[in-house]
Amino acid sequence: VYNDKLYGLQIWHNSPEYVMVYNKTLFEENGWEIPSTYAELKDLCAKIAEQGITPWFMPGADGWQHQLAFFQIGGVYEEATPGLYDALNTNQATFADNEKMLEVLNEFKELSDAGYFGEDWIGTDSTNLTNEFGDRNIAMAMANSSYIQQIKDDTGTEDEFGMFLIPLGDNTWYPTNPAGPTMFGYKGTEHEDLVKEFFNFVTTTESLQEILDNSPAYTNVDMNDDAIEQHWLPEEEEFLATVDDSKKSVSVLQTGTKYTNDYWMQFGQDMVAFCQGEMEANDV
């Protein structure tokens, strides 16, 4: 809705998207602490690797996931350079020569060089990710919060899991992403009343509850309807309680900037080339 006019209808959730999911039980058994800075993350990865466990599973062969480590922490870039998003969107700034972005890319490569993403992470996909978690072969991975339930359902593990923010660049920002699948009515339709009626139908409490109850990937729907029975996971509520609302005010990079999504795959290829020593960070 903009200026009291309906342009599209978005039915989506408000769950944490692509944060760090970790094996909480494994952490507790080994006395590992959740890292809040890059230095702490690197030290943690070293301790995990000593146990023969992949610290941070990175499915490079998927081609689209490893970029999230860079894009999901948009708030840390905006914090370092206030007004960056506006400058990027008006072609007054670029990723190149941005100190914080270069810092994050170099940290990513440092972890890659150390083997903390797993052996041949560039050639590994996420097909077996739930089993990797269930078998305790890995300790952490970027995933949506609902993935925790999928791990338990797929593997039967009794381990508990939790979430924390991606700490590259000493990030403390939540990956706010106010974008999702949206339904639109055709402006030139001869059946405008039917479009409106359909929108009214799918936004009734009963319809929204039906959508939520039959969508395994959803634990909630982000709608202005207090009558909906949400299914928040305890892990989600625990994680969200650790994030201050002031740290939710900046969108992820791919939503806050106009062109990032268009170059998503190319950026991912460049990240791989950088990690392989075929490209400089400033050229990514």
Residues covered by each model-derived region:
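Glycine-centered hinge/linker elements that transmit conformational signals in sensory
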Residues: 45-47, 90-121
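C-terminal capping/gating helix-and-loop segments adjacent to ligand/active sites or protein-protein/ligand interfaces
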Residues: 176-177, 219-223, 237-284
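Extracytoplasmic/periplasmic substrate-recognition and gating elements
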Residues: 29-30, 114, 153-217, 252, ...
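Short, solvent-exposed loop/beta-turn-alpha elements that line the ligand-binding surface or hinge
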Residues: 1, 77-103, 153-156, 165-176, ...
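Short helix-initiation/N-cap motifs at beta->coil->alpha
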Residues: 38-43, 120-134
